[in-house]
């Protein structure tokens, strides 16, 4: 049976590991160290570690694999293949070149578009109507290896980064399992990435989280769903942070300055730069838990002044 080392960390990686382990001999799982989580800073294992322990697979958690003693242990396993999916560290050539069939990665974009750590976020931020998964060879340069297989999936207006992560993790697992038989048999010729089409999905900055109400409504709508459920787009209301977790978009145009409020007893609408409307459905005022807009408008939102604007 083919011996595989699997490397991954978040929930996205779990279906890939589970599918691999159902058919192949996964001899080791490498994931990030346990991290403090939440206000109480409880030391919490990554999702992949939990899944690996349930499957009784040995787990390695080096802080920095490149300088870890565990690197030589992994090479000594003499695996046939290394598979990664959102692991979170650049791997040294000594490990990439050690397996018989090399090292491959399950990446959540249609490469060469969106190399980097936030491809799902950027697909939504940019208003894409489709994205997908690419399986490619691992090289030391970030997400730059030749492409082995690729599969597309649509993005709808009802999707956000959370729903797309779920869809892409399942798609990635399916594509990998469909690809491996021919790949291991040497029947697939990998295709180099077109350097003219390379784009990058760098980590989201705090500046990208803040809503600019002078922008078009569609752009703001894409920002809200692209940053949900993490890190969440925000604006300000009476100079205090105000997060918008979920919203819909109305192309109907209204008169009003960017950030102007149109509200009744149960709904809240905000005017964008082009006059179209953002309609928040799940929000989080400063110092409060997240809530549906109806609850807000029948509570603190009742006192919103018609002259109040978001972003001020």
UniProtKB/Swiss-Prot annotation:
The keyword Transferase applies. PANTHER family: METHIONYL-TRNA FORMYLTRANSFERASE (PTHR11138), METHIONYL-TRNA FORMYLTRANSFERASE, MITOCHONDRIAL (PTHR11138:SF5). Transmembrane segments: none annotated. Belongs to the Fmt family. It comes from the Bacteria. It catalyses: L-methionyl-tRNA(fMet) + (6R)-10-formyltetrahydrofolate = N-formyl-L-methionyl-tRNA(fMet) + (6S)-5,6,7,8-tetrahydrofolate + H(+). (6S)-5,6,7,8-tetrahydrofolate binds at residues 109-112. Signal peptide: none annotated. HAMAP family: Formyl_trans. Gene3D superfamilies: 3.40.50.12230. Its EC number is 2.1.2.9. Attaches a formyl group to the free amino group of methionyl-tRNA(fMet). The formyl group appears to play a dual role in the initiator identity of N-formylmethionyl-tRNA by promoting its recognition by IF2 and preventing the misappropriation of this tRNA by the elongation apparatus. GO terms for molecular function: methionyl-tRNA formyltransferase activity. Keywords: Protein biosynthesis, Transferase. GO terms for cellular component: cytosol. The keyword Hydrolase does not apply. This is Methionyl-tRNA formyltransferase.
């Amino acid at each position: 049976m083919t011996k595989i080392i699997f490397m991954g960390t978040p929930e996205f990686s779990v279906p890939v590991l589970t599918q691999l382990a159902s058919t192949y001999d996964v001899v080791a799982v490498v994931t990030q160290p346990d991290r403090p989580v939440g206000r109480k800073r409880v030391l919490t294992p990554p999702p992949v570690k939990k899944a690996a322990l349930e499957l009784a697979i040995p787990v390695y958690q080096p802080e920095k694999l490149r300088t870890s003693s565990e690197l030589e242990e992994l090479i000594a396993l003499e695996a046939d293949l290394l598979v990664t999916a959102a692991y979170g560290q650049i791997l040294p050539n000594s490990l990439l070149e050690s397996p018989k069939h090399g090292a491959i990665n399950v990446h959540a974009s249609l490469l060469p578009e969106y190399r980097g750590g936030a491809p799902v976020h950027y697909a939504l931020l940019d208003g894409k109507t489709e994205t997908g998964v690419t399986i490619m060879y691992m090289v030391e340069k970030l997400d730059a290896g030749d492409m082995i297989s690729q599969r597309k999936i649509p993005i709808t207006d009802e999707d956000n980064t959370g729903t797309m992560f779920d869809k892409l993790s399942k798609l990635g697992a399916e594509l990998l399992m469909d690809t491996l038989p021919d790949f291991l048999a040497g029947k697939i010729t990998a295709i180099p990435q077109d350097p003219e089409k390379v784009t990058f999905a760098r980590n989201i900055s705090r500046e990208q989280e803040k809503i600019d109400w002078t922008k078009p409504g569609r752009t703001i709508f894409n920002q809200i769903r692209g940053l949900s459920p993490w890190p969440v787009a925000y604006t300000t209301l009476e100079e205090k942070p105000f997060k918008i977790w979920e919203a819909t978009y109305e192309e109907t145009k209204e008169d009003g300055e960017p950030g102007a409020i149109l509200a009744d007893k149960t709904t809240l609408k905000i005017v964008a730069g082009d006059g179209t409307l953002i309609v928040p459905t799940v929000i989080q005022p400063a110092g409060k838990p997240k809530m549906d807009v109806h609850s807000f408008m029948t509570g603190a939102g009742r006192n919103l002044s018609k002259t109040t604007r978001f972003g001020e």
